[in-house]
Amino acid sequence: DAVRPGIAIYGLRPSWEITNPLVNELQPVLEWKAQITMLKEVPSGVGLSYGHSFHTTQPSLIATIPLGYGDGLNRNLSNRLEVLVGGVRCPQVGRITMDQSLLDVTRLRGKVGLGDEVVIIGRQGGTEISADELADKLGTINYEIVTGISSRVPRLEEGINSS
């Protein structure tokens, strides 16, 4: 007998068609995080990023994270992605570029700062964003999301017993 764990080693459901009740016990272990590297107050009516695909509709606080399509953050998520900052869902705005993405953190004004953690996949507080959520937005599967995270993104293993 052999076992082929595949994506289950990351605690992700291999397929929604699997009926084995044990698949419901899988818990995601992969997290994808970044940190805020810049904060900027932007007036109403300003177009952001390449092509100005997003325009502010009010004075806004915009955060930059050093994560883009070169890191595996699919460009087709532009203006459709939400991330977690301080446990609050915040929209990504403008086009995702090769090395950076912009976030509208206006609702966190006065509570957000440089270096704050941003969760792309994972849990923060009581809120979670899953690889399946991103896959649904792109019309694909969770495998494509997690295997698309490029080698530019550092990998850290936590809770591994090295003895």
Model-derived features with residue positions:
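Active-site anion/phosphate-binding pocket segments in diverse small-molecule metabolic enzymes
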Residues: 1-163
